[in-house]
Design a protein with these regions (language model features):
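Ferredoxin-like alpha/beta domains used as RNA- or RNAP-binding modules
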Residues: 1-101, 128-197
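Glycine- and Gly-Pro-enriched alpha-helical subdomains that act as flexible
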Residues: 117-120, 125-127
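Short, well-ordered loop/turn sites that connect or cap secondary structure elements
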Residues: 113-114, 133
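Beta-rich strand-turn-strand
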Residues: 104-107
Length: 197
């Protein structure tokens, strides 16, 4: 499946809060559908629960199914808890770091800034949103949109990053831990979903 370009609030209503997908808050707190909220309680199958957790991750970080499967396979080969390593790889992507630094309102916007060449890493222009940032790298931008967004959307910056709002620069201090990830997701269910692939 290619990149999702459809209605984003509909996804938020179905899956719950996804801070990387949109800044909008839905008016109704039940899933979208023709006949409104269902009156009967339907039991969710185990497959559906795992699929929804996987979809949360995909939509929040804006990755395709193929990319996510590649991240899962790479996390399996590494030493350590597979679920935490998967989340760490997704969180250390350049577009995610730009979003976490407060330079963009969503990960989608951060992805666009990166692909348009508005972000530099250690003084080099990087146009690949999936670039894996490592400890000690400095992310900088002099582009007007990013400088404005850093003043507007600057929320709480995670402790693994440091930011200088005046110069629109940020630095990766250390690798992200599970407690610093802002998305509510059960990574073990995602690993179980991909266990047959």
């Amino acid at each position: 499946m290619a990149r999702y370009r459809g209605p984003r609030v509909k996804i938020v209503r179905r899956l719950g809060e996804l801070p990387g997908l949109t800044t909008k808050i839905p008016n109704r707190n039940y899933p979208a559908g023709q006949h409104g909220p269902s009156s009967g309680m339907t039991k969710m199958s185990q497959y559906r629960v795992r699929l929804q957790e996987k979809q949360k991750l995909r939509y929040n970080y804006g990755v395709s199914e193929k990319q996510l499967l590649g991240y899962v396979r790479r996390a399996r080969r590494m030493k350590g808890p597979t679920g935490e390593l998967l989340l760490q790889m997704l969180e250390m992507r350049l577009d995610s770091i730009v979003y976490r630094l407060g330079f963009a309102p969503t990960i989608r916007a951060a992805r666009q800034y990166v692909s348009h060449g508005l972000v530099t890493v250690n003084g080099q222009c990087v146009t690949i949103p999936s670039y894996q940032c490592s400890t000690g790298e400095v992310i900088k931008s002099t582009a007007a949109p990013i400088v404005e967004h850093s003043k507007t959307y600057g929320g709480v910056v995670p402790s693994h990053l440091s930011v200088d709002k005046n110069n629109a620069t940020g630095k990766v201090e250390r690798n992200v831990t599970r407690s610093q990830i802002g998305l509510t997701v059960n990574e073990l269910l995602i690993i179980e979903f991909y266990s047959r692939k």
